[in-house]
Amino acid sequence: MDLVEKLKNDVREIEDWIIQIRRKIHEYPELSYKEYNTSKLVAETLRKLGVEVEEGVGLPTAVVGKIRGSKPGKTVALRADMDALPVEENTDLEFKSKVKGVMHACGHDTHVAMLLGGAYLLVKNKDLISGEIRLIFQPAEEDGGLGGAKPMIEAGVMNGVDYVFGIHISSSYPSGVFATRKGPIMATPDAFKIIVHGKGGHGSAPHETIDPIFISLQIANAIYGITARQIDPVQPFIISITTIHSGTKDNIIPDDAEMQGTIRSLDENVRSKAKDYMRRIVSSICGIYGATCEVKFMEDVYPTTVNNPEVTDEVMKILSSISTVVETEPVLGAEDFSRFLQKAPGTYFFLGTRNEKKGCIYPNHSSKFCVDEDVLKLGALAHALLAVKFSNK
């Protein structure tokens, strides 16, 4: 029996076990940096499987498992993120979230379950492994600021790693389909804040004020013009203003207005140009109307997620032995898995969960997001298959 058939047979034995783990985590979701029960479940499960476990790697809720092979070889890292989102779940699932205002709306519950399933398969087939398989259960991917990957890396989780792989469940692809690409696959997210300082006054006499709301509207229109006017329209790039705050009463023109939003890009030159254009636009428009301004960008954001071309080519061939594989366009979401890929070559890929018959049609981060659980065994199988193959390179 070849490797693929052996692992397929083994994963059938634990399909229900993987689903039950996922449901338990889904019922009790935990926000970034607070994944206490989730990380406890992970550590306990790994120990029961006979996996060497280290807790608190870089962050209190981080867990790392190590499976050592029967002979020398490569070190392969597999990663799953664990945190949930501040979303009130709006589904009829029997195992829907029991935590008010918190939901696994991005599928990280499935990521944990699939990697635990992969751990089971790898322990059972330890004789096929060379080197070391490192299982990274990461907190705080959804933080969007520091994120959980950076402190784990600083604590040494990637030391000696030769290859690294990660899976993300996605409703953008049909159930059971793997999707990835060579090179940039996810964007850098530059969060920004623009503050316009004007001069307030009575709503009946706007000519006596420097109206920060009016000025903010001019800035917003001009900023949206950066796309396809200053930046090549064939480049994957977007600017979105997502919050505008100003004022307290209908007859008062306020002193200040604040806007926040995000820039998403895959290319460092495009990113730099966009930020420069934004600063110039804000400064110029505020100057015209006599206002002052501040433009702030979040520091140390997630880098662009860049798949190694050679490794990804091989990954696509390997995954095609267990399901359909498609080459996807870049996604303008962001991921701190990008930090792991800066330390070792590897591949980040999606596993489709869209299934109209089961009502799994809502996007990630939706309050109605649901997952076709039939795909979870595929994720576990993919983890194990890639680990065995690349540990023996």
Swiss-Prot record:
Annotated source species: Saccharolobus solfataricus (strain ATCC 35092 / DSM 1617 / JCM 11322 / P2)
A Pfam short name: M20_dimer
Protein name in the entry: Thermostable carboxypeptidase 1
Binding site for Zn(2+): 104, 109, 245
Cofactor dependency: Zn(2+)
Keywords: Carboxypeptidase, Hydrolase, Metal-binding, Metalloprotease, Protease, Zinc
Any GO BP annotation: proteolysis
Record EC number: 3.4.17.-
GO MF, any single term: metallopeptidase activity
Encoding gene per record: cpsA1
Role played: Can release basic, acidic, aromatic, and, to a lesser extent, aliphatic amino acids.
Sequence intervals crossing the membrane: none
SUPFAM superfamilies: Bacterial exopeptidase dimerisation domain (SSF55031), Zn-dependent exopeptidases (SSF53187)
Gene3D superfamilies, alphabetized: 3.30.70.360, Zn peptidases
InterPro entries documented for this protein: Amidohydrolase (IPR017439), Bact_exopeptidase_dim_dom (IPR036264), Peptidase_M20 (IPR002933), Peptidase_M20_dimer (IPR011650), Thermostable_CP (IPR053493)
Recorded family membership: Belongs to the peptidase M20 family.
Active site: 302, 373
Classification via NCBIfam families: amidohydrolases (TIGR01891), carboxypep_CpsA (NF040868)
Subunit-structure text: Homotetramer.
